[in-house]
């Protein structure tokens, strides 16, 4: 039996971008994809945009539209709806880098010992084609988690059994629920993972976790500290703030090497 991959998109009032996201999923060369959209009760034309794609997916798209308490409750809803062997999340204003991304990911999961894979994420301007930076997962190891460093979540795919075993996302977090889940995956469950040198997703810069200077400098660190504490993992403010110097280094590397224009 072919491996089914569930791609979950959480959306709220994204009529301007959600169609790009759905087209990106529809264009994938890997045929065994289940697309799940969890709408949080949009008041614009988001649901109408989603409904236009139901027939195009030929039974492979499921969606729900109802109010929720936040993004992580919505992500858990999508997880419960998923019937795939492997699960990944694609933000409602992001797209896959190319048509072959999921095919490459599926090939890696043919190795039964692999629990999860992740690659790289590209950032571009919200209303432009120029790429701003590349967030690579190549240097990640679980020992970096207490420093606030984690794999790029939009590039992360894991077996659904891992999510079930860990209990899914902790809805008490506003912006660090993915980090807290990674603490459980890598530090407690000790999942077997593989880094792929693959640009998985192109993100529009400005999501909830990097929208403002305050959230980057203060809000994120407060939640990261809380996540470590509830999981019994030692960290401190100095360790968490050191990640900003690492991020600056990544930006500098991006600025001094040739980069390019991304086109859909």
Task: Name what the model sees in each region.
Residues 198, 211-238:
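Catalytic core of nucleotide-sugar-dependent glycosyltransferases
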């Amino acid at each position: 039996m072919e491996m089914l991959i569930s791609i979950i998109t959480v959306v709220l009032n994204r009529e301007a971008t959600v169609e790009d996201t759905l087209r990106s999923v529809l264009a994938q060369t890997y045929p065994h994809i289940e697309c799940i959209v969890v709408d949080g009760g949009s008041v614009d034309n988001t649901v109408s945009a989603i409904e236009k794609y139901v027939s195009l997916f030929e039974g492979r798209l499921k969606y729900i539209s109802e109010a929720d308490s936040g993004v992580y409750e919505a992500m858990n809803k999508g997880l419960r709806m998923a019937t795939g062997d492997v699960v990944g999340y694609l933000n409602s204003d992001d797209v896959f880098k190319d048509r072959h991304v999921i095919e490459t990911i599926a090939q890696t999961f043919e190795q039964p010992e692999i629990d999860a894979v992740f690659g790289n994420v590209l950032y571009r301007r919200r209303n432009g084609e120029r790429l701003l930076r590349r967030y690579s997962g190549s240097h990640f190891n679980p020992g970096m988690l207490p420093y606030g460093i984690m794999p790029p979540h939009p590039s992360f795919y894991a077996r659904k059994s891992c999510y079930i075993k860990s209990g899914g996302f902790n809805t008490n977090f506003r912006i660090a629920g993915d980090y807290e889940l990674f603490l459980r995956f890598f530090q407690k469950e000790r999942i077997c993972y593989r880094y792929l040198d693959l640009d998985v997703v192109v993100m529009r810069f400005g999501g909830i976790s990097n929208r403002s200077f305050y959230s980057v400098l203060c809000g994120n660190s407060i939640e990261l500290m809380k996540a470590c504490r509830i999981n019994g993992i030692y960290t401190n403010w100095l360790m968490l703030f050191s990640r900003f110097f690492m991020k600056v280094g990544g930006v500098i590397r991006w600025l001094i090497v040739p980069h390019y224009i991304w086109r859909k």
